[in-house]
């Protein structure tokens, strides 16, 4: 039975992959409609539960009248069927209604709907541009995806569980009281007006506070995660006081807004408690007066009193649930600000798969400024022939890494074109483009998975023998087989820690090189690929890289010029423009910027291949 209900929602179902709606109602509807049969069933369950609750109180009133009017000898004989029916309602129907409710909420909606939302929002956010992630905390993004899904589910279930249940219960109570005497409905009707007015006054204010509080919580989470993620820098600069202050500032703002919210809650609770007391007193007074006028029975008085007390008890539950609803709505709105943003870098509607037959790279009149008014790259054109090995040289900020980012379409050019084998990278799918490029960067980030998972990331279907061979060529196999983690995993199954923190910089770089060697893409980009290696290991790995370069188009970036001196051609960039181009020897003979950079590097040496 449990498995049946747990499998009703397919978390990984095909879904709308467009931008989530920016409106609150639209955002809720996008995900609630995918679970609407179960939410509708929950409403039916709530309807039956509320009617059963009211019928039990009405039955109590009938018992009081029966006990007053019937002798003990004839009670069961005349009314036994009524007692049997109510026994079935209380012992069978009521538990079944509760079971149906719990199965729907706990087995179907809670896990299924929540993880469906998380899966779909995660997939959408994962396809955002690098700029999106550069402008926010990773911890804040993750927190909003995880928390907003749970909050959307909770607020939806709370509306059905509390507001729908109480609406049916109150309407049924008014009908029962009106059946006895219309004047018995007056206290309850007046209480409903006061209660709704109280909620109307306080709940919107609490909602605004909840939205602010959700933002404060996300900022606090982001700052704490940022400190933990960069713990090495925090320890290195020995300035824990600054980190304390950074977190204290966010925590203080969160505390202040939390206190402002709780003040409103306390005032609302006072108003509701006062109106509850007035309801019980007024209902009792009207019922007793009607009884003194022989206009109602003792059973009807018992029903009226029972309903009044039950409603006042439920009012506190509804009040706290309403607060929870808007607290959750605030969290959903905070999540929407992160999730429901348009994807700024998407495949064209008619995008084709990139095919690389030769590997020619062409930049045609490219202009790009990272959204600024000027600088970086203006009207840049050059061609890298198929199989040519080109080194990009220049001071920091000259535009070297920007060219690589444009080639990989991490950003779109503002004008001009970037082509691979005559195909505009803006007109092919991003996945097919990046599958054709192998890249090693100086900032080597590894996934918090096993060594094997990281090496296989570029070619998941590769056999284990090929993976180990790639590690050996990257001079990584020797240290990998000696690794172990705290869970007893060893060698290639060892977890590397967040961003590969358990490995040294050189070890991370060798794993990254092994990953590219295994991927074996036709275009190779090396951005300071050996910057974290010592000279001996670097020289050995260079041999593997040179063999990998055979038959491939290569772009290499390095500040240590000796590592790229053997390239077929060097392009020297200055402020986004090409100022020199030629071989290593030609540029030295020219005596320009490259020659000056070469002379400035202390301990520089000519690679044997460049001599």
Feature map (PLM): residue ranges:
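Alpha-helical segments in transporter systems
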Residues: 26, 37-62, 83, 87, ...
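ABC-type nucleotide-binding domain
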Residues: 354-611
């Amino acid at each position: 039975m449990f498995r049946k209900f747990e499998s009703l929602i397919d978390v990984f179902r095909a879904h709308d992959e467009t931008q989530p709606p920016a409106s609150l109602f639209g955002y809720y509807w996008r995900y609630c409609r995918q679970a609407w049969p179960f939410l509708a069933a929950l409403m039916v369950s709530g309807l039956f539960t509320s009617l059963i609750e009211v019928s039990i109180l009405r039955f109590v009133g009938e018992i009081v009248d029966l006990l007053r009017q019937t002798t003990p000898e004839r009670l069961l004989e005349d009314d036994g069927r009524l007692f049997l029916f109510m026994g079935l309602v209380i012992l069978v129907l009521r538990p079944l209604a509760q079971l149906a409710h719990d199965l729907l909420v706990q087995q179907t909606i809670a896990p299924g709907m929540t993880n469906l939302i998380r899966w779909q929002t995660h997939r959408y956010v994962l396809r955002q541009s690098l700029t999106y992630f550069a402008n926010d905390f990773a911890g804040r993004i993750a927190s909003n995806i995880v928390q907003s899904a749970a909050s959307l589910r909770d607020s939806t279930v709370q509306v059905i569980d509390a507001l729908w249940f109480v609406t049916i219960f109150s309407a049924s109570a008014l009908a029962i009281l009106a059946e006895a005497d219309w004047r018995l409905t007056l206290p309850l009707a007046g209480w409903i007006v006061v209660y709704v007015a109280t909620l109307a006054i306080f709940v919107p204010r609490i909602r605004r506070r909840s939205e602010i509080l959700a933002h404060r919580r996300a900022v606090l989470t982001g700052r704490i995660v940022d400190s933990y993620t960069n713990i090495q820098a925090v320890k290195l600069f020995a300035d824990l006081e600054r980190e304390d202050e950074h977190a204290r500032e966010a925590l203080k703002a969160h505390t202040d807004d939390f206190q402002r919210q709780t003040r409103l809650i306390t005032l609302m609770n006072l108003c509701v408690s006062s109106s509850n007391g007035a309801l019980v007193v007024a209902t009792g007074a009207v019922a007793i007066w009607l009884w003194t006028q022989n206009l109602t029975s003792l059973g009807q008085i018992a029903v009226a009193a029972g309903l009044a007390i039950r409603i006042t008890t439920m009012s506190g539950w509804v009040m706290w649930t309403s607060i929870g609803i808007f607290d959750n709505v605030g969290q959903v709105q905070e999540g929407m600000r992160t999730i429901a943003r348009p994807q700024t870098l998407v495949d064209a509607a008619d995008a084709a798969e990139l095919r690389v037959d030769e590997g020619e790279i062409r930049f045609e009149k490219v202009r790009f400024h990272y959204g600024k008014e000027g600088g970086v790259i203006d009207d840049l054109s050059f061609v890298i022939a198929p199989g040519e090995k080109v080194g990009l040289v220049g001071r920091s900020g000259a535009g070297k890494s920007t060219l690589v980012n444009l080639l990989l379409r991490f950003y779109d050019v503002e004008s001009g074109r970037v082509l691979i084998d005559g195909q505009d990278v803006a007109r092919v799918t991003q996945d097919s483009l990046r599958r054709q490029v192998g890249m090693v960067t100086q900032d080597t980030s590894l996934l918090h998975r096993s060594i094997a998972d990281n090496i296989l990331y570029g070619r998941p279907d590769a056999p284990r023998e090929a993976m180990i061979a790639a590690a050996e060529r990257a001079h990584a196999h020797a240290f990998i087989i000696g690794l172990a983690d705290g869970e007893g995993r060893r060698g290639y199954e060892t977890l590397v820690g967040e961003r590969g923190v358990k490995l040294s910089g050189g070890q991370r770089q060798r794993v990254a090189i092994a990953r590219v060697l295994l991927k074996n893409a036709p275009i190779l980009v090396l951005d300071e690929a050996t910057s974290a290696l010592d000279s001996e290991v670097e020289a050995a790995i260079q041999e593997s890289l040179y063999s990998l370069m055979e038959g491939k188009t290569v772009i290499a970036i390095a500040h240590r010029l000796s590592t790229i001196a053997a390239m077929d051609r060097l392009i020297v960039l200055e402020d986004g423009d090409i100022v020199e181009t030629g071989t290593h020897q030609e540029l030295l003979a020219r005596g320009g910027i490259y020659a000056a950079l070469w002379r400035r590097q202390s301990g520089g040496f000519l690679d044997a291949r460049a001599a």
